[in-house]
Amino acid sequence: MYARSTTFEGMPANVEAGIAFVRNEAAPMLAKAEGCRGLSLLVDRATGQCIATSSWDTEAAMRAGDRELRPLRDRGRDILGGSLEMDEWEVAVMHRTSHGECCRVSWLQGDVEAMTETFRVGILPELEQTPGFCSASLLVNRATGLGCGTTVWESRAAMEASRVVADDLRRRTADEAAGEIVEVHEYELAYAHLHLPEMA
């Protein structure tokens, strides 16, 4: 399984219009794309930063759909009123127990194999014991050594309450991967229809 994420640095006042665009235009178009499993949208209403992620059965399917979907990304950028950056990933881990409202995204640089094993064997069991936890995923780019870990929580209160635990788990993952934490950001999960299978 593969994923493409597009990070929009938009205007806070345009976030609601961006959500409507994803729900009413982007999602229906992606539903017709061969090999596409779905779409999610994370938003930070305070900064205007939004991340749209599409999931794909194969790398070939993801690449094949790129030309057709490029105008869609450009339209999303215009609606949100900012810039965009695109990343492509392999889905290394996916585990879901229930749906949630908010998520925390952590970007780490390091040994991708060690990062994946630590996330699967050491991190997931502890997350499952944390109140309010709903799901977790790890996307990796083997060429760059970058990993993107996302945890989903049932509410903003649950996400905030998990920060101390999350900080410890994140540091442990970075240490095991002989790497570093690049960035951490919390978002509202505005649209969640990725339809990825269990990969834990």
Predicted feature locations:
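Short S/T/G/P-rich N-terminal loop/turn motif that feeds into the first structured element of a domain
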Residues: 1-51, 57-200
